[in-house]
Curated annotation (Swiss-Prot):
Acetylation at Lys-413 dramatically reduces catalytic activity. Deacetylated by SIRT3. The modification N6-acetyllysine is found at residues 45, 48, 67, 69, 80, 106, 155, 166, 180, 193, 199, 256, 263, 272, 275, 280, 282, 384, 400, 413, 442. Its EC number is 1.1.1.42. One of its GO terms (molecular function) is magnesium ion binding. The gene is IDH2. This is Isocitrate dehydrogenase [NADP], mitochondrial. NADP(+) binds at T115, I116, T117, R122, K299, G349, T350, V351, T352, R353, H354, N367. It comes from Macaca fascicularis (Crab-eating macaque). GO terms for biological process: 2-oxoglutarate metabolic process; glyoxylate cycle; isocitrate metabolic process; NADP metabolic process; tricarboxylic acid cycle. Keywords: Acetylation, Glyoxylate bypass, Magnesium, Manganese, Metal-binding, Mitochondrion, NADP, Oxidoreductase, Transit peptide, Tricarboxylic acid cycle. Pfam families: Iso_dh.
Length: 452
């Protein structure tokens, strides 16, 4: 723990006069600080701010390098900084997480470093006041929206499903259903009923679910028209942004009322708000049964958005991540129903195992690509909102450089293991350590930008 604090405080000191655990939003470096850092005179000017949410452990260290070496030398941007590192969340009673989400509502774009969600062991390690909730969950509850996960394709990284030559983006409706259900064990014979009592005082509705002859289990779950509608809007807007077709999967043949409501709301919103834009972009929307959809996904080459209910999205997103090769090559973007507000982050965690090695002074080979893409996806969206083509081009160039660097043979250990097997790879023969890989990306980016 002490080592962790020393590292993150030294990082904060290195980035200027910013206090290590300030709960308020902090801006990007002053012009005087930028001069000291020898930033280029002709950086891309960005008119409006981006919210930056710092994180924990190994990803925090990598995040700092990305910002200082890959982003700020080329982009003149005001960053509204929030330290979501676990010590600061504890110090501010998690108010910093709430503040960061409210700032995202105000400025429309946020980039987020991976953060620790504490369990009992973390409470003890960090001597926390309490077991704070997942910051992602807190942010999602304030912003609403849908989390879209998309793989980063590198041609030389083998895929468990070789036919997936284009990305498949999965949108999970992270609200209700089994995750907010009430379940119970029936320990004897009896009748299980559902009751709905209208607020307007009209008649109570009652359904007999099952008459248990002996013990068993039961469950009641729900969702709301408002949440389903927000999910639908996010999915349609994301598909238009990507210019990819959208598929929505349910089991409405079995859950005729429950899943049927998802199907009907999606269709109504599509017909009323999005059909014209879909036709203009030559893409389409289609509802499919979940079992048929799973089969079609495995046979497809990719290149579409898949809208899933909560449980389906939980399961299928992990299948997609593994099928495409690595969680280190998976982006995650929270898209709000307004189509304007997003929060981009890596799909993986804080890479604790590598951080423990780093604390001992040992080099690691930690994959930074998903964290880099969190920055690029946020900056690209800022560019689209502001009509800043230079910023869009920069973000796309950095993404292209990351992919081309891996495809040229320079990569981290996790990716080399996908090709050769983890037990067979050797440092500097098959993979680079973290710093050398990031330096390689920096050199390649500088070269690519010099050509433009």
């Amino acid at each position: 723990m002490a080592g962790y604090l020393r590292v993150v405080r030294s990082l904060c000191r290195a980035s200027g006069s910013r206090p290590a655990w300030a709960p308020a939003a902090l801006t990007a470096p002053t012009s005087q600080e930028q001069t000291r850092r020898h930033y280029a005179d002709k950086r891309i000017k960005v008119a409006k701010p981006v919210v930056e949410m710092d994180g924990d452990e190994m990803t925090r260290i990598i995040w700092q390098f990305i910002k200082e070496k890959l982003i700020l030398p080329h982009v003149d941007i005001q960053l509204k900084y929030f330290d979501l590192g676990l010590p600061n969340r504890d110090q501010t009673d998690d108010q910093v997480t709430i503040d960061s989400a409210l700032a995202t509502q105000k400025y429309s774009v946020a980039v987020k470093c991976a953060t620790i969600t504490p369990d009992e062991a973390r409470v003890e390690e960090f001597k926390l006041k309490k077991m704070w909730k997942s910051p992602n969950g807190t942010i999602r509850n304030i912003l609403g929206g849908t989390v879209f996960r998309e793989p980063i394709i590198c041609k030389n990284i083998p895929r468990l499903v070789p036919g997936w030559t284009k990305p498949i983006t999965i949108g999970r409706h992270a609200h209700g259903d089994q995750y907010k259900a009430t379940d119970f064990v029936a320990d004897r014979a009896g009748t299980f009923k559902m009751v709905f009592t209208p607020k307007d005082g009209s008649g109570v509705k009652e359904w007999e679910v099952y008459n248990f002859p002996a013990g068993g289990v039961g469950m009641g779950m729900y969702n709301t028209d408002e949440s389903i509608s927000g999910f639908a809007h996010s999915c349609f807007q994301y598909a238009i942004q990507k210019k990819w077709p959208l598929y929505m999967s349910t089991k409405n043949t079995i859950l005729k009322a429950y899943d049927g409501r998802f199907k009907d709301i999606f269709q109504e919103i599509f017909d009323k708000h999005y059909k014209t834009d879909f036709d203009k972009n030559k893409i389409w929307y289609e509802h499919r049964l979940i079992d048929d959809m799973v089969a079609q996904v495995l046979k497809s080459s990719g290149g579409f958005v898949w809208a899933c209910k909560n449980y389906d999205g939980d399961v299928q997103s992990d299948i997609l991540a593994q099928g495409f090769g690595s969680l280190g090559l998976m982006t995650s973007v929270l898209v709000c129903p307004d189509g304007k507000t997003i929060e981009a982050e890596a799909a993986h965690g804080t890479v604790t195992r590598h951080y423990r090695e780093h604390q001992k002074g040992r080099p690691t080979s930690t994959n930074p690509i998903a964290s880099i893409f969190a920055w690029t996806r946020g900056l690209e969206h800022r560019g689209k909102l502001d009509g800043n083509q230079d910023l869009i081009r920069f973000a796309q160039t950095l993404e292209k450089v990351c992919v081309e660097t891996v495809e040229s043979g320079a990569m981290t250990k996790d990716l080399a293991g996908c090709i050769h097997g983890l037990s067979n790879v050797k440092l500097n023969e098959h993979f680079l350590n973290t710093t050398d890989f990031l330096d390689t990306i920096k050199s390649n980016l500088d070269r690519a930008l010099g050509r433009q």
